[in-house]
Amino acid sequence: MRVAIAQIASIKGNIEKNIENHLKWIKLAIQNNAGVLVFPELSLTGYEPELAEILATNQDDSRLDEIQNLSDRNGITIGVGLPTKDERDIFISMIIFQPYKERITYSKQYLYPLEQPIFKAGKNPIVLNIETEVVSPAICYEISNKAHCEFAKRNKATLYIASVLSYINGIDDDMKKLSDIAKNNNLVSFMANYVGESGGYKCAGKSSVWDTTGKLIGQLDGETEGILIYDTETKEIVKKTLDGLILTNNK
């Protein structure tokens, strides 16, 4: 299976325009035969906690239907970031689209302290069975909580995919955490991060994949939008941009 992570810049608070941009990256992943594609944390709004209350919606929002259509027609599982709400609370969520299945909302269970006054912690840990893999989704600060990756390990996850906002001063620490998660739990681990600015942060890019020894085996740069694809069978790494360039670096 080919697993893709998207490294993008989001437009602050503009769900409609961000959906348009997401569709371009989804189509690029489909062209490269990806079976899974995951975007950064709160990718459809940008990481903008102060706007979450007015932007929050739910998985059945009709604006998301074209993402579902692409999933259905192309057999791809897609994870996008979105603030969601119920009758009382607001959550940092990943909406998961699977072919011809009801959408899933996975909400961040372990919140960063500054998020706690605004958001409620999710209560429903999940893993996803996709082809021959078991995928554990994670949202940013969850990589700092051992209980999250321990749940993944107990449930026989093979892939750990973190949807994050990691900024310039925090990227090295986040990369170390994900390397350790890979090594200590026998998980191929991924990080989908932003470039540009979001939430007042200068985002660091460097979206990455680590093998089960914790070795960094693929990484995008710190500035360019692109997708990073890993083939779980052949171990091939592919890097693509919308203009067709193949990104190159030392990984």
Predicted regions and their residues:
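Structural motif
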Residues: 35-36, 135, 159
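CN hydrolase (nitrilase-like) catalytic-core segments centered on the catalytic cysteine
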Residues: 62-79, 144-227
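Cys-nucleophile CN-hydrolase/nitrilase-fold catalytic domain and related Cys-dependent amidase chemistry
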Residues: 15, 27-99, 168-187
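Short, acidic/polar
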Residues: 17-28, 143-150
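Active-site catalytic loop in hydrolytic enzyme cores
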Residues: 85-155, 168-170, 174-176, 233-250
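Extreme N-terminal starter segment of soluble prokaryotic enzymes
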Residues: 1-5
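Short polar catalytic/cofactor-binding loops
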Residues: 7-13
